[in-house]
């Protein structure tokens, strides 16, 4: 039995989340409240929302937790060449926070294998849009010939980044945005990106599962650090990244 949260109720301890033998491992609580204040409270405790249209807001704390250290992003020799070409070619641009809400809508509308519909509801877009307006959520966007062709968004608290979703309308467009994000976060001492749930795709990018207790220790430390400001794309940071040896494939 999970907890039902009224607007002023605290979250229960994450250890009460449903276990691996249940139909919904990691499910902790449900509510109608999806205010920016509730979201911030959740992220600072390693909790995230994930639900479908017609459901209450479902709150999760998975164990293990999938995370990506910025320096662990797997960059093949082929993709490294792609990044170098993108950095040289004026047809390509990488932008930060050009249109956060447009990125969210693109993530919501992009079909995904094995998913029917989207969890990025109008309420989700409004809540994260409010965080963005307060400098606590950001988008990294890949543009080609004046059109946004890929991107991602997430929440930034202190030196912790919580990845939410990404999309691509052109080959490698979302991965280009992810590489730019990792280069930026790595240059600011961010130890990890929260990827939430374990998937083969995330593992192929270099993400790995860690125990929830270890993840929460990272969250407490990193989120208490000063926030990164300003958020902007520095081409030279990604150029230095592409100059390092290619990550061996595993």
Swiss-Prot record:
One GO biological process term? protein catabolic process
Q: What SUPFAM superfamilies does UniProt report for this protein, alphabetically?
A: Acyl-CoA N-acyltransferases (Nat)
Entry EC no(s): 2.3.2.6
- GO molecular function of the protein, one example? leucyl-tRNA--protein transferase activity
Which gene is annotated as encoding this protein in its UniProt record? aat
Q: What sort of enzyme, by top EC class, is this? A: transferase
Q: What does this protein do?
A: Functions in the N-end rule pathway of protein degradation where it conjugates Leu, Phe and, less efficiently, Met from aminoacyl-tRNAs to the N-termini of proteins containing an N-terminal arginine or lysine.
Return the InterPro entries for the record. Acyl_CoA_acyltransferase, Leu/Phe-tRNA_Trfase, Leu/Phe-tRNA_Trfase_C, Leu/Phe-tRNA_Trfase_N
Note the Pfam families from the entry. Leu_Phe_trans (PF03588)
Tell me the superkingdom of the source.
Bacteria
**How is this protein named in the record?**
Leucyl/phenylalanyl-tRNA--protein transferase
Q: Where in the cell is it found?
A: Cytoplasm
* Reaction(s) this enzyme catalyzes, per UniProt: N-terminal L-lysyl-[protein] + L-leucyl-tRNA(Leu) = N-terminal L-leucyl-L-lysyl-[protein] + tRNA(Leu) + H(+); N-terminal L-arginyl-[protein] + L-leucyl-tRNA(Leu) = N-terminal L-leucyl-L-arginyl-[protein] + tRNA(Leu) + H(+); L-phenylalanyl-tRNA(Phe) + an N-terminal L-alpha-aminoacyl-[protein] = an N-terminal L-phenylalanyl-L-alpha-aminoacyl-[protein] + tRNA(Phe)
- Of which family is this protein a member? Belongs to the L/F-transferase family.
- According to its UniProt entry, this protein's organism is Cupriavidus pinatubonensis (strain JMP 134 / LMG 1197) (Cupriavidus necator (strain JMP 134))
What is one cellular component GO term in this UniProt entry? cytoplasm
Which UniProt keyword terms apply here? Acyltransferase, Cytoplasm, Transferase
